[in-house]
């Protein structure tokens, strides 16, 4: 392995590791702040965490899960074997299709948020603290978050394919603020 490749590998590894560590620290601070500022005596903390489960599930599927894992090798193949215009067309079609799917899921999610809450947390139905209503309201607000986080993850996959690792590694830290 050439010294240039070793340096590039080391630089990219340190960049991604550093930004991942920063992201984890920001995530810890965020979770601590949530715990401190949302008293669980009213059940608000439980409602908050339930409302975040569904968008985070979609984030794992569309953002950081199967889609990104499948997309990077396909895009890399296009990048290495096709003309620049074909690659750009593939990227445009991919983003357009994903945007359409995420908009549909977001709109449906906003409309059926209370039903989803009662399916995931049936104990909220007769809660003395109206946790179901609070969680449903929070979930309605979180579906647009799901749209943006999933789209951001696909854009990060594109950047990774083009050997740009700093911005995709830093993005989770910004989203934890």
Give residue spans per PLM region:
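Membrane-embedded alpha-helical bundles of multi-pass transporters/translocases
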Residues: 1-177
């Amino acid at each position: 392995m050439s010294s240039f490749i070793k340096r590039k590998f080391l630089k990219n590894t340190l960049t991604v590791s550093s930004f991942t560590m920063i992201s984890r620290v920001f995530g810890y601070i965020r979770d601590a702040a949530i715990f401190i500022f949302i008293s669980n005596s009213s059940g608000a903390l439980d409602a908050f965490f339930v409302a975040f489960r569904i968008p985070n599930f979609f984030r794992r599927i569309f953002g950081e899960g199967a889609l990104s894992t499948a997309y990077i090798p396909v895009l890399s193949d296009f990048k290495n074997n096709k003309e620049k215009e074909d690659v750009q067309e593939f990227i445009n079609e991919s983003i357009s299709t994903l945007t359409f799917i995420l908009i549909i899921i977001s709109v449906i999610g906003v409309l059926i948020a209370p039903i989803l809450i009662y399916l995931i947390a049936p104990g909220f139905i007769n809660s003395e603290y109206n946790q179901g209503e609070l969680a449903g309201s929070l979930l309605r607000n979180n579906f647009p978050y799901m749209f943006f986080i999933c789209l951001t993850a696909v854009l990060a996959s594109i950047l990774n394919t083009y050997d740009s690792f700093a911005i995709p590694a830093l993005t989770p830290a910004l989203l934890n603020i």
